[in-house]
Amino acid sequence: ALVSVAAVLGVEDGRVTTLRLGLGGIAPKPWRAAAAETLLVGSEPTDEAFSAAIDLELVDAKPLPGNAFKIDLTRRTVVAVLRRLRDEAVTT
């Protein structure tokens, strides 16, 4: 995999109650996205919030030569995964 995302998202009453977010393929070891988790817990689970959280998480990322594309790929993948989890949580 070029990048991977592992996530657990809990939503109650229109707010993120739980979030665990791990990223793979963008660092020498799996990366726990603690800043993104902290920002999102308590917020509304919108695509904009997801995007802002992963942008905050990756603001200091320093990709190796030839791997800069992985930062944008990670951003898009995180938002897509969290959107899917949110939509599943809302419909179940």
Explain the meaning of each model-derived region:
Residues A1-T92:
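C-terminal structural segment of proteins
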